[in-house]
Amino acid sequence: IDMIWINGENFQSAKEKDMLYGPFTDKLPNFNDYVDADSEDVKLDFAYPTDGYEAPYGKAQVVMVADTAVTPDLPTSAEELKAFVQKYPGKVTYPALPDFTGSAFVRNIIYEICGYEQFLTMEADKETVKEAIEPAMEYLRELNPYLWNQGKTFPDSSTTLDNMFADGEVVLYMTYGAYDTAVNIADGKYTETTQSFQFDKGTIGNTNFMAIAKNSANKAGAMVAINEMLSPEVQADRYD
């Protein structure tokens, strides 16, 4: 393995176990020319310093997806989502944790209800965090009776939920792929009236990166490839 698509706890674990080559980003012309190296999105990966051991490849943002012909009243906050779920009982759910998207949805509810700032400096012990997020947990418990299968079980993955949405079994889908809706409309999977949306306060987003394995036999080639992936042409082509 030469190049690795990585972010979050996987990057932190690999870096702390000395499995990554670097720092290398300062050797990439396209990184130096087109990337804001001082941006927090580049300097930090899930609050962990990147230190030049990974180069940004793309960004993801949690969005919700609904068919406006079926549900024209799209929720713009957690409180409106509760009313939405109650209006469409049995037709809303989210992927079972620890699914990546399901976890992001729950974290988004936590930030929406409990606020985000307190977690930036909070002591990371179980009891402190548990107490801080209790209002959001109570909110989720209040949703359960109105969810698909009364919240007793949840879809095993975001892929399963996507298929349930496309089949009309549920009326809401959530994804990290902000461009998935347009692609699925073009492919005929979603109706033309399907729309992605976010809460008014926004949703969780993150950056994904490319790293190089420390035991790579072709580190120079990996750097050439990553540099090319940072070019304006390749980045623009990702959104065609």
Sequence positions of predicted segments:
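Loop/turn elements at helix/coil->beta-strand transitions in domains of secreted/extracellular proteins
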Residues: 2, 88-92, 145-148, 168-171, ...
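Periplasmic-binding protein-like
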Residues: 87-98, 228-240
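Hydrophobic packing residues within well-ordered alpha-helices of enzyme cores
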Residues: 14, 106, 183-184, 238
